[in-house]
């Protein structure tokens, strides 16, 4: 029950600021509840498959999802995530804390770049105006494999990396990149979850507790997002992975 209540409170906070919670879930489970980090990674990654599903549907209805690109990047992302989960399961726990924390700090830097450099930049979608060439296809495949392996190895969603890749490499608009990132994360989470599950690291009771708390909390928190100053939301989105990384280093 303590895990559900904690995840509920965390979900409210994350839903309010609109930040990704994978790193926070890992940090809370390992630091507060002393869950082994491999189990925490498996739980966090699998939980993302459920929490992003509603986001994908919502963004698709708004027309912010590039289905073909998302399908290709996500498909190869699932392969990369499965491979990454096999690699992550071999990393000793004491080293995995450092690696995951490092990835969270790096994701904060990428989030800063996205929010500062791209947020107010008008950009036409190159995807609509150019042929789907072999070079473009290779970019999709590489983006999927790299971000998928990162997510599978370290249990984080890699959303800032995926979003920047979609904008810089594939020419999507900011709106398209947000919605398409949700679609990409879905198969990545499934692939990584299957990989960790096959290694015996997925605790289904723990997963259910995390899902109940975070999904309910995020729904409540999102209701209050419009009342927060925009600068506070941007600051919170950058500092969330930083705080999660610091918590992991305390373990």
Name the predicted role of every residue range.
Residues 1-12, 31, 37, 61-153, ...:
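Juxtamembrane transmembrane-helix boundary motif
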